[in-house]
Amino acid sequence: MDPRLPAWALVLLGPALVFALGPAPTPEMREKLCGHHFVRALVRVCGGPLWSTEARRPVAAGDGELLQWLERRHLLYGLVANSEPAPGGPGLQPMPQTSHHHRHRRAAASNPARYCCLSGCSQQDLLTLCP
């Protein structure tokens, strides 16, 4: 056996080992996910209705449920903002004037889709949103 053979093997395998043992992308890497990219990532992490262990539901019903869940908080804020108190009845007290920046920040903190779009979400963040 030629003694140079193991040396050549190390020279050829060295770069492959560096790439294999180098820093791997972590699942905690935050990625900004907006719109349909957020929904696709959520379905990829949580699984879709076809893969769920629950009773099989039609795909359309699963999509509708996901969309309702994503927009639920936004709709609640819209209903409160658009409601008019009944005359003479107890109604919502007007909120003190706050800057647009604070309202925007508060809305982003309570809406997971908006948060992932603005700040980015890791795979672990998406897992916490699974039903």
Swiss-Prot record:
Signal in keyword set: yes
Sequence segments annotated as region (Disordered): 86-105
Tissue: Highest expression in the Leydig cells of the testis.
Pfam family, any one: Insulin
One GO process term, biological-process aspect: positive regulation of epithelial cell migration
Disulfide bonding pattern of the chain: 34-117, 46-130, 116-121
Subcellular location: Secreted
Stretches assigned to coiled coil: none
Propeptide: 58-104
Main location: secreted
Position of the signal peptide: 1-24
Database matches in InterPro entries: INSL3/INSL4, Insulin-like, Insulin-like_sf, Insulin_CS
GO molecular function: G protein-coupled receptor binding; hormone activity; protease binding
SUPFAM superfamilies, A to Z: Insulin-like
One GO CC term on file: extracellular space
Subunit structure: Heterodimer of a B chain and an A chain linked by two disulfide bonds.
Family stated for the protein in its record: Belongs to the insulin family.
Physiological role: Seems to play a role in testicular function. May be a trophic hormone with a role in testicular descent in fetal life. Is a ligand for LGR8 receptor.
Protein name: Insulin-like 3
Organism: Callithrix jacchus
